[in-house]
Amino acid sequence: ALALAHAHCLAQRHAAAHALALRKGNVESATCTDCHGEHDIRKHTDPTSPSSAKNVAQQVCGNCHASLRLTQKYGLPSQSFQTFSDSFHGLAVRGGAVEVVNCASCHSSHGIKSQKDPTSTIHAANLVQTCGQCHEGATARFAIGKVHVSPETADGQDGSSPILYLIS
């Protein structure tokens, strides 16, 4: 019954980065219970759920993506969680806003893929559509703006903006 009720999640997850890592033997990769819990499972619409809009970044994604040990071990960007947390969107989430972008808004929740994958929500060819989910009328120029910006990378050379970094 669980598999039938969650068939859409399982189908998306099958080709996602975490599932691919598990199939390669990486037992530290996220599974359903890492995000949803084991016993006290709540819908993502429940504000007390770890996977709710206001909690997902800190209580789910941040558990692994803020870990220097895990990001270094698996060759992941070590600053992604911190740069999101320090961004306009991250500050809004930390301030308690629920109608704001979180990790799943851009990366998806069950279909997380590398930005190099043409089917990824964060692949360059898909950014206008991804950003347009919240920013109606988003253009290609809008979509090249960086969300993960740090003082070290806010030089304007790659679409990052030192001014936006300072504002956030």
What kind of region is each of these model predictions?
Residues 1-165:
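Inter-heme linker and motif-flanking segments adjacent to c-type heme-binding CXXCH motifs
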